[in-house]
Amino acid sequence: LNQDDMIAARPRTPIRVCLLGATGTIGRATLATLMRRGHDVVCFARSCLGGALAVDGPEIRVVDVRNPVSIARDGFRGERFDAVVSCMASRTGTPRDAWAIDHQAHVNVLAAASRLGVGHFVLLSAICVQKPLLGFQHAKLAFETALVESGLMFSIVRPTAFFKSLSGQVERVKRGKSFLVFGDGALTACKPISDDDLADYLADCLEDDRRWNRVLPIGGPGEAITPRQQGEALFALLGRKPRFRRVPLALLDSVIGTLSAAACLAPPLSEKAELARIGRYYATESMLVLNPETGRYDAAATPSAGTETLFEFYKRLVDGDAAPERGDHAVF
């Protein structure tokens, strides 16, 4: 047995976990994994979303994570917790939302956890923070820094790409339309990871001391894949000849420029401009480990975990065995 197998095989000691972001797709998968492993899980959730949790068993506490008083009074309640696991993230990625949730809400929870002597904080971050050009990336990095400097044991997990973020074109291709790519479809690559595989990785952080006090980039199994390869695989599953439509990056640049200029007169458009900038980032930057010496993305240096591949997920979507759930962060 290798060390991973030995860790998986050894008896687990149940611990008490505060779970943030349990109503998102990754959060729900993480909740199910933690419950399956026998941990005592308490979810901090907004009142309007608490009923979305499909897993029986966890205690759900209605907490406003933007309010330190609510976190202490309604959340932790002065009780003992062994760990905090956060899958919480801003819904849109716009600066105001990101600094409120990705940074300040986490700072609030960290402060309360520190006062109560919580021993471990597992944070779901994102691999894109290694090259921060956007507001939400700076917000995430600011909290990463606060966590590292807090003195709490930490595990900062930076996944590559989620299956849901790469599934936005499945339905359009099933309807007979072409697959959209930026440039030639090979500008970027990623090693996407499934919800369940990432949930296992997050839960393992509680038990595997090799993941303590570390920043952990992680992708899914297999080779890195480009958008064009994603399209080719999808057409193959449908038994059709590949059809691609190229979207010039200049189009995104034009949209960004127009919205940015218009935002001077209509400030609400600034958020739309930021969303366009986010789209351009994902269209031009690979979700892989960035080599600081060469400035290049390195698929070989990007660790892998799990068993499910994106193309297996595509097959489930095509066969109707899974439903796409893209959320707010899908490019298409």
Specify the residue positions occupied by each region the protein language model found:
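Non-catalytic, hydrophobic alpha-helical segments
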Residues: 26, 84, 198, 202, ...
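NAD(P)H-binding glycine-rich loop region in Rossmannoid oxidoreductase-like domains
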Residues: 49-115, 128-130
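Substrate-positioning beta->alpha
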Residues: 185-206, 214, 226
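Glycine-/Pro-rich loop/turn segments that contact NAD(P) or position catalytic residues
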Residues: 90-176
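Glycine/proline-rich active-site loop of Rossmann-fold NAD(P)-dependent oxidoreductases
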Residues: 165-172, 205-216, 240-242
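N-terminal Rossmann NAD(P)H-binding glycine-rich loop of SDR-like oxidoreductase domains
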Residues: 15-39
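A hydrophobic C-terminal alpha-helical subdomain
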Residues: 250-332
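Glycine-rich Rossmann NAD(P)(H)-binding loop
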Residues: 182-188, 214-224, 238-239, 247-249, ...
